[in-house]
Amino acid sequence: MATHTVQPRTTKVARAPRRGAASRPPGQRALVASPTTWFVWAGVAAFFVFLVGILVSVVVDSLGRSWFGSWLPEQFTFSWYAAAWERFGMANVIGVTLLVAVTVIVISVLVGVPAAYLLARRSFPFKRTISLLFLLPVLMPPITYGIPLATVMYNMGLGRTLVAVILVNLVPSVPFVIMTMTPFIEQINPAIENAARMSGARMRIVFTRILAPLLVPGILAAAVLVLVRTVGMFELTFLVSGPQSDTLVVAIYRAMTAAGGGESRPLISSMAVVYTVTMMIILVIALRYISPTQLVARVKDSRDD
């Protein structure tokens, strides 16, 4: 009689997930505390401590009545802001800064977007050379072409005027919009335009009613970058501006280098705080209405369509 040997059945016990792995989203790696990781985080922390320390020192200096040989001023006051507002005409300076920035944005978009469309959709001789020429004002230091520009402005009788400030800031801003919008337009499916043309739509209708809504995220992103660049542009503005056409960053420099050793340090710090707050407001508004993730997603959707 044959006997059958029954092998004992072995069951695999599922290994319990490591602590914290269940709560981690799929595809996300755990932070490994390697020496390189600690070194990177230490560098980031040191940078932020240094940056925050500078900002705090400027703010405290703008609020201190007297600050000599101690960690904090003896008294705090807002009178330096009122004095700087009256002394340097901050209302006019901020108004000029915003006027220059908005004008440069509008002209740069009106000129740069059609030019970017031509570079993205049309083939013509010396196209690559023209694209490289547009890159030069963006890549070169502003002072290298700022001095010849200033010479031209003064020879034309536009020196120390608001018109000159706007014109010189357009030189890097228009190519910047072109270089920003060209790859953005290239990602839009050309079949959308071809379908509209086959339906009898003219080029103006195609551009304003079909392409324009798709280009809005890219235009807003380019406009914000031009805004930040124009407000912070010192070299070109300084070379052609005057007392009534100084932007905020140039006004700060003139206050620091005024005759007699410059203005009081708390006054300069007050102007620096106003400039920093202005730039922060611009960035907050930009991040509020422009999301890089949504911008890329919208371009991808239009490409897939």
Set out the residue ranges of the language-model regions.
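Amphipathic cytosolic juxtamembrane alpha-helices at the membrane-cytosol interface
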Residues: 37, 99, 125-131, 194-221
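Transmembrane-helix boundary motif in ABC transporter permease subunits
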Residues: 31-32, 102-134, 151, 287-288
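Hydrophobic alpha-helical transmembrane segments of multipass integral membrane proteins
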Residues: 91, 95, 99-111, 115, ...
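Membrane-interfacial helix termini and adjacent extracytoplasmic/periplasmic loops
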Residues: 25-30, 69, 78, 126-127, ...
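Membrane-embedded alpha-helices of multi-pass transport/permease systems
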Residues: 53-56, 60-63, 110-114, 147, ...
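Interhelical loop and adjacent transmembrane-helix boundary motif
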Residues: 30-36, 66-69, 81-89, 231, ...
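C-terminal transmembrane helix and the adjacent membrane-cytosol boundary/short C-terminal tail
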Residues: 2-23, 28-29, 37-42, 64, ...
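Transmembrane alpha-helices
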Residues: 42-43, 48-55, 178-181, 189, ...
